């Protein structure tokens, strides 16, 4: 999880034009405590920078865990059914 976290920060801090980060979760089958904590940290730090954290293609049991923990409501961004939905919506709101 720390590798992903560091990569996100590196990319966001290197480009001040980034307004949204989307994590494609199609390969995620479960979320453990350390991954949950990492997502909370990333969400908070990105929000402090004015960058939204969004998730796409979240599987049912992972979505259940995010809802149960409250993280689904705490996200600075949204959870999208598909990556295409995320791209379309975020592009539309970025062009306003």
Regions found by a protein language model. Name each.
Residues 1-96:
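Structured cytosolic domains appended to multi-pass membrane proteins
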